[in-house]
Amino acid sequence: MIGKKFSSIAVVILAVGWSASYALAEDAAPDQDKIAAGETVYNTRCAVCHGDELVNSGQTFDLRRLKADERPRFDNSVRNGKNQMPPWKGVLSDDEIDQLWHYIRVHAFQK
């Protein structure tokens, strides 16, 4: 009796754990549409200063160094500008900034 109860509990725990890990994997999967749209935004608005490879030989911030937890910093810099970078608030939509973030994060991870 105890063995059956233990087996049932183990199956439930495994099922819940598997479901949660599958859901996390789904959430973590890169959104290819956002990445492609972000590439367009980057190439038309950012590459001229930040370079084709997210870095411009010390002239601008090396975007490859952005960490996943720096999203608020990124959003603030893009919207309000920083140092020599002009503000893009009113030029780029929230969706474009989000797309840009996804593009940079995927490519920064690969560098």
Task: Kindly give the residue locations of the regions a language model identified.
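Residue-level detector of flexible, active-site-proximal loop/helix-junction positions
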Residues: A23, E70, L92
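C-terminal capping alpha-helices of c-type cytochrome domains
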Residues: V78, G90-K111
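Residue-level detector of conserved, well-ordered beta-strand and adjacent loop positions
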Residues: R64, P86-K89
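Gly/Gly-Pro-rich "capping" loops immediately C-terminal to redox-active cysteine motifs
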Residues: Q32-E39, G51-K82
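Short cysteine clusters
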Residues: C46-C49
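N-terminal export/targeting leaders of redox proteins
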Residues: M1-Q32, K111
